[in-house]
Amino acid sequence: MILREISDRVYYMPNTEETDRPTLGYIRGDFFSVMVDTGNSPGHLKLFYEGLKERGLPKPEFAVITHWHWDHTFAMKAFEGTTIASRMTNEILDNVSSWKWTEKDMKMRLISGEDIEFCDIHIKKEYENPADIEVVTADIVFENELSINLGGVHCNLKLVGGPHCEDSTIVHIPEEKVLFVGDADCIDFYLKQ
């Protein structure tokens, strides 16, 4: 099975280190379903959709973005629903959406420190042609907290920051006692902290 079950309402797809595909989450409510992060590419998102089909689960109407990093956001354009992010994340995505994905531009971002070698290497592994990358902003933006009633279960979003990046958002599902943290508890690869 592509997706692993935490409960009859919460599932996840494990990460894949080779191409830096992060864990993706899924919360099924009686009215709506939510995805946690959209993944690092349309191919990653497609595999997630295949996992939903395999389990007989509906595609999510919403996707919550935990932070701006490429591996969590570069499939937003391909997501077949409404995306939600904190204002801070959205502002960063707005900046990244102007980036060009030529070899020269990618190299210049490494030199300037705007991007890091770890991401550059994994982007090139995930994308046959990085010029296909299209970064977009979220459809819905929240300030610090947002609660979504999915029907029988809630998703409580909270901007918490953390050691990984200042725009980290957590997703708490209190009825299921589940917390998706994205990478909020990881080190900052950009500042190597």
Enumerate the language-model features and the residues they cover.
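Conserved beta-strand hairpin/beta-sheet module of binuclear metal-dependent hydrolase folds
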Residues: 3-50, 169-183
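Short loop/helix-cap segments at secondary-structure boundaries that form the rim of catalytic
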Residues: 4-5, 73-80, 149-151
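Metallo-beta-lactamase
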Residues: 5-6, 96-159
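A short catalytic or substrate-binding loop motif that flags glycine-/basic-rich loops and adjacent residues
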Residues: 17-19, 140, 161-165
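Active-site neighborhood of phospho(di)ester-bond hydrolases with catalytic His/Asp-centered motifs
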Residues: 35-39, 60-69, 84-86, 159-161, ...
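Active-site environment of divalent metal-dependent phosphoester hydrolases
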Residues: 41-43, 68-74, 90-93, 164-167, ...
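Active-site metal-binding motif and surrounding structural segment of the metallo-beta-lactamase
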Residues: 43-89
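Active-site-proximal loop/helix segments of hydrolase catalytic cores
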Residues: 154-193
